[in-house]
Swiss-Prot record:
Protein name according to UniProt: Large ribosomal subunit protein uL14
Organism in which the protein naturally occurs: Mesorhizobium japonicum (strain LMG 29417 / CECT 9101 / MAFF 303099) (Mesorhizobium loti (strain MAFF 303099))
Single GO BP term: translation
Role noted for this protein: Binds to 23S rRNA. Forms part of two intersubunit bridges in the 70S ribosome.
Entry keyword set: Ribonucleoprotein, Ribosomal protein, RNA-binding, rRNA-binding
Binding partners and assembly: Part of the 50S ribosomal subunit. Forms a cluster with proteins L3 and L19. In the 70S ribosome, L14 and L19 interact and together make contacts with the 16S rRNA in bridges B5 and B8.
Amino acid sequence: MIQMQTNLDVADNSGARRVMCIKVLGGSKRKYASVGDIIVVSIKEAIPRGRVKKGDVMKAVVVRTAKDIRRPDGSVIRFDKNAAVLVDNKKEPIGTRIFGPVPRELRAKNHMKIISLAPEVL
């Protein structure tokens, strides 16, 4: 459950390390984002010589949340930290690698490129 001002880790090699959510996309009154949703983020911490720099405003897809994700079979999955992958306006990842596991729910939201780059799909 991601809302405005939430800090997230970046799960790709775009050069950003930490980002902060500044808007949840998808309706004027929408407050929360979950796995697979697109948010607008501000880069708060970045490595030198990365593709992005501190202060940039970009879009990102939420790939891991500390809030549980309920599945239709009754099982629950949750992660230790909130994480996102930076994407461009065509919803393609900016980085070439994804770090850590991603949930199956990304497939239903049509983020196939992220799923194909991820080392593990839970």
